Amino acid sequence: MTTKNSSAAPAKRVEDKRPGFFMDLLRRLILEKPLGTFGLGVIIIFFAAGIFSKFIMPFGYQQIHLLERLQGPSAKYLLGTDELGRDELSRLIYGARISMEVGLGATFLNVLVSILIGATSGFLGGKTDMIVQRFVDVWMSIPGFVILLTVMTILPRNLIVMILVLGITGGIGGARLVRSAVIAIKSNIYISASDAIGCSPMRILLVHIIPNIMPTLIIMFTLGIGGNILAEAGLSFLGFGLPPGIPSWGVLINSSQAYLQTDPQLALWPGLALSLSVFGMNMFGDSIRDLLDPRLRGGVGRYSLSDKKLKQLKASLAK
């Protein structure tokens, strides 16, 4: 009697063809949030102008043409010239680069400081949490712009100092939001299980808690860029921000005050650029918040049942 050894054919691996997190987020943004999509387009144009500013500026941003000062828009100078004959378009494009550096750098520091303070406070709890939160309460009771004006009066006025000041001062206020997210995650059972099997507190914080508050951090980052750009422009307009040699949009608006009656376009172009960029970033940030935060979407998260499917499920169970 002979037996045949039949071997089952190896099962083919089923590939997961679902889109990645960011691609899925982009698809939902385009389909569900038209204003957010508009904001994303503004951000792309704004960042492209900042990154490639040296290649697309018609003239050097400090190049002076005294014989062509205070000219209106023309074929040579598309947006006109300022009081020293410098090309307004070139200075506006270079200002986008300054705003991009301030916005990204300061917001990155915002999130980093918020994680260091908020995650530590929320994870440790107890007296540490109480002491840290009382400090945050006192800090938030002082108007933020007053703090910025005071600090920038003492420190030297340059780009690095501006980024550090905006990043650190803004990050302390954001620590409370990170703390709330950490406390919500810390109550999950897998955190207790990780502690029970001997994981160190640092490993639990870095491996299990921080990755799970990424939606909160992404929302903080996208909403913070516009605020930091606006803060830098406000400080520079008042004379407490960047020095006149750096053509940020706030500096351009400040230098145009003496010519508002005769040449209002000197303030018009940087004002429009500032308003449009901040509006676009805020619309994009609001849309990302709505898409990532289930509480703002009626409790329906990415992997939850929609209202329609939930009703269908209840109807089938009732039968």
Put a short name on every predicted segment:
Residues 19, 81, 124-127, 155-157, ...:
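Residue-level signature of the cytosolic catalytic core of signaling kinases
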Residues 28-29, 87-94, 130-140, 151, ...:
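Short amphipathic alpha-helical coupling elements at transmembrane boundaries
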Residues 46-50, 152-153, 166-172, 223, ...:
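Alpha-helical transmembrane segments of multi-pass membrane proteins
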Residues 52-67, 157, 161, 236-245:
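Extracellular/periplasmic helix-loop junction at the C-terminal end of a transmembrane helix
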Residues 78, 82, 88, 109-116, ...:
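Generic hydrophobic transmembrane alpha-helix motif, especially the helices
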Residues 86-101, 105, 125-133, 183-187, ...:
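Amphipathic cytosolic juxtamembrane alpha-helices at the membrane-cytosol interface
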Residues 151-154, 166-167, 181-182, 223, ...:
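Glycine-rich helix-loop "coupling/hinge" segments at transmembrane-helix boundaries
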